[in-house]
Amino acid sequence: PVDIDRYDFIRLGVKERWAVLLPAEDPLVQKGFVTAADLVGKELLFPARLKVQNELVSWFGDYFPQVRVPYTCNMSTNASIMVRNGLGYAFHIEGSRPFLDRSQVCSLPLYPELAATTVLAWKKRQPFSVTTTKFIEFAKNFVKTYNNREQ
């Protein structure tokens, strides 16, 4: 979820899945995905943004009162280090995982899937240079063409 109230934006149409970073030796790795029930009793690292936290709480449903969220973290690099050092399981967008040793930290998608869409955003009523204006026009046309091709 993105707070776009103060911004003009283009929705890029790319779906990004949420996933969990966990220690590579965790038995859940063999399962290939993570459910809310799998995370009961685990210490979790949530993203710091409240809108994202609300999405995750909703995904957990009735299981949420049974989990602990002692930490928040905005950077997947920091989250990976915290997971590697045994501080918990971290939520992140699949593919945002930094270049750490995969033999220490793994990423598994959530099931049921929780997805977000990406936006390209810029401040409303902002004067832009010619270059920036041309870039925004290009991006709008590109996304429109791309989305029409995907349908």
Residue ranges and their predicted role:
Residues 28, 69, 107:
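Short clusters of hydrophobic/aromatic residues that line enzyme substrate/ligand-binding pockets
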Residues 3-11, 15-17, 32, 38, ...:
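Beta-alpha-beta core module
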Residues 64-65, 100:
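Short helix-capping segments at alpha-helix termini
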Residues 1-2, 17-18, 23-33, 43-53, ...:
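Short coil/turn segments
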